[in-house]
Amino acid sequence: MTEADGLRQRRPLRPQVVTDDNRTPEAKGGSSFSGRVFRATFLMLAAFLTIPLLGALVLLDSPIDPEPLSFKEPPLFLGVLQPNTKLQQAERLFENQLVGPESIANIGDVMFTGTADGRVVKLENGEVETIARFGSGPCKTRDDEPACGRPLGIRAGPNGTLFVVDAYKGLFEVNPWKREVKLLLSSETPIEGRKMSFLNDLTVTRDGRKIYFTDSSSKWQRRDYLLLLMEGTDDGRLLEYDTQTKEVKVLLDHLRFPNGVQLSPAEDFVLVVELAMVRIRRFYVSGLMKGGADVFVENLPGFPDNIRASSSGGYWVSMAAIRANPGFSMLDFLSERPFLKKVIFKLFSQETVMKFVPRYSLVLELSDSGTFLRSLHDPEGQVVTYVSEAHEHSGHLYLGSFRAPYLCRLRL
């Protein structure tokens, strides 16, 4: 045995070196423990959020009780409906001087409209002048609307006066020059045993004798228009008021959100927009078909608001929400799913839901037989937003809105 061999035999055992491999089991164990903690925390958080949500879905009442509605596939946005930006060529008028000019009428070149703060105003020489108010203030929030009033449909009569329907107050005649207001029919007056909760639009015969108007619902008020649309309540009516006899007749009942109305040029029928059914109904008021009704046009490319005469002998129809095709229409999707609509309005306010509705404004011109003639678009609602009416006068379209702080004018 050599000395070296002896030294090798007597060499003490080397201390074990701690390496990464040696730590691996401990690290894996720590990782496993951390993973369990993360999963447990995640599950607790999910339960913390889910249980109240489920409780809300079970315990909270939905403000609506919708029925399933079925629509045809929307018309393709091709040809006459090909998207364009023509509405973006419009100019804004009276910006930040008024809000929500829903409907427009003219006497000569003087324009009139109703606003969200309950006023009827005259628009002349760049100035906004209040000529009537049917309610009383304050007029700042949706809760104020019933007391404040909300003028909607407005028409010029034959004697230099205006006929105005207020969603909450009733049917009025206004002398804009003398600022005189006459109540023709109070919304508090029950018609055939039912109240009028949401007066909307009107059209007047040339002699001023008959006024045809819509009551969108006997259940919902204007401030809850989105709930009415989502529920699709069939309690809307088309009515007739005789300015001489003061008699009121129900012409059509069981309408789902009737909105705009327009007499034909010959005054033999009245067109009434049925917003929740994306169609326009026709009721005959004279001639061989008197008392009869049919569908004038159905399966519109959007949800129609007001309807007004065009210089071509047809009609302008305004739409603040479209049924995109190709594309996706949330309102069409929800129409056949009442449970989803109930859940949405259990959890979210109308104002929150409105934020998810694309601001696509569409104005459609119809022929006298209901065929599509042309369409004007603002795909992003950049200029014309929440469009409610297209009123033609002297080669221009005056474009109303139920929310915008201005009026728009487009040269045709």
UniProtKB/Swiss-Prot annotation:
Q: Which GO terms describe its molecular function?
A: arylesterase activity
Q: Which residues carry this modification: Phosphothreonine?
A: 19
Q: Which InterPro entries match?
A: 6-blade_b-propeller_TolB-like, Strictosidine_synth_cons-reg
- Record region (Disordered): 1-32
Key word Oxidoreductase present: no
Gene Ontology cellular component terms for the protein in this record: membrane
**Ranges per topology, Extracellular:** 61-412
Glycan attachment positions: 159
Task: Please provide the record's keywords in A-Z order.
Answer: Glycoprotein, Membrane, Phosphoprotein, Signal-anchor, Transmembrane, Transmembrane helix
Q: Which residue ranges are assigned to the Cytoplasmic compartment in the record's topology?
A: 1-39
Pfam families annotated for this entry?
Answer: SSL_N, Str_synth
Where, subcellularly, is it found?
A: Membrane
Q: Where are the transmembrane segments?
A: 40-60
Q: Per UniProt, what is the membrane topology?
A: Single-pass type II membrane protein
Q: Give a short account of what the protein does.
A: Exhibits strong arylesterase activity with beta-naphthyl acetate and phenyl acetate. May play a role in adipocyte differentiation.
The UniProt similarity line reads: Belongs to the strictosidine synthase family.
Q: What is this protein called?
A: Adipocyte plasma membrane-associated protein
Q: What is the lineage of its organism?
A: Eukaryota, Metazoa, Chordata, Craniata, Vertebrata
This protein's gene is called APMAP
